[in-house]
Design a protein with these regions (language model features):
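An N-terminal, globular interaction/scaffold subdomain
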Residues: 22-120, 125
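Glycine-rich, mobile lid/loop segments that gate access to catalytic sites or pores
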Residues: 141-156
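N-terminal basic/disordered segments at the start of proteins
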Residues: 1-26
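Beta-sheet entry/capping signal
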Residues: 7-9, 136, 144
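Glycine-rich, often proline-containing surface loops adjacent to acidic residues and nearby aromatics
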Residues: 98-110, 144-146, 165-173
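Loop-centered beta-sheet repeat module
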Residues: 2, 152-224
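Extended, Lys/Arg-enriched charged tracts that mediate electrostatic binding to polyanionic substrates
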Residues: 111-139, 194, 199-215
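A short acidic (Asp/Glu
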Residues: 21-23, 148-151, 216
Length: 225
């Protein structure tokens, strides 16, 4: 399903802070073990991505290390991580987002603290809506469900890791290759948000002064041969 690299690779995500142009790097801790390790390594390549890239440099490097398609936004992470071949897949990730006039900010999933019971309750309510559009849904863990179906074919998705780094524009969210597909996905996302808005799980969370799950993030879409 993937081709292993010829030699071992060590990838250290988020090792460099994303700072405004001209800003000075803050002081770093000593990290003697990491410094010793780096002394035995050599950089294999430099990745430079545009600010509006739907993936982070780490994700592109990781895709290459696994022998996966490395075009930002087009790496089939869901299919790869779930071990599914021959059908379009994606992750649906329960999240809390805030929609601004021009951009979208996402709360880190860890701050939601969604447990298995609540996640499965949300999935059970969401599943019939997806089934109506020919999509199948499978629970894998509280913060990630696997969705499969033709409606996902050819999607380009902004990764959640990228969105957590800084706000993204609405145009950077999941993009469909055809207008009909795009309309279907927007309708489905709207229906899902309305369902979540009145869901008992969210009613309970709001009583407990916890962030509600108000959206499902689509990411890692693609197909493995």
């Amino acid at each position: 399903m993937s081709v292993a690299p010829a030699s071992p690779h060590v990838l250290i995500p988020d090792a460099v802070l994303a700072l405004p142009a001209g800003a000075a790097q803050p002081p770093w801790p000593e990290l003697p073990t990491l410094r010793a390790l780096v002394g035995h390594l050599r950089p294999s390549a430099t990745l430079a991505l545009d600010d509006d890239s739907p993936a982070t440099p780490f994700e592109v490097a990781l895709a290459r290390a696994h022998g996966l398609p490395d075009e930002p936004g087009r790496t089939p992470w869901a299919a790869f991580e779930a071990g599914v071949a021959g059908t379009p897949c994606a992750w649906l990730q329960p999240c809390h987002w805030q929609m601004g006039m021009n951009d979208v900010s996402v709360l880190h999933p860890g701050e939601l603290g969604l447990d298995e019971h609540a996640s499965r309750a949300l999935l059970a309510s969401v599943e019939p809506l997806l089934r109506d559009d020919g999509l199948t849904l499978r629970y894998l863990r509280p913060d990630a469900w696997l969705v499969q179906g033709e409606l996902l074919r050819g999607l380009s998705c902004c990764s959640l890791r990228r969105a957590l780094a800084r706000p993204v524009t609405r145009e950077q969210l999941a993009q469909a290759p055809t207008d009909a597909q795009g309309r279907a996905l927007r309708r489905l996302q709207s229906e899902l948000q309305m369902l979540l808005y009145t869901h008992p799980v969210n009613d309970a969370r709001e009583r407990e002064r916890r962030w509600p799950v108000n959206a499902l993030w689509i990411g890692g879409a693609g197909e493995l041969p």
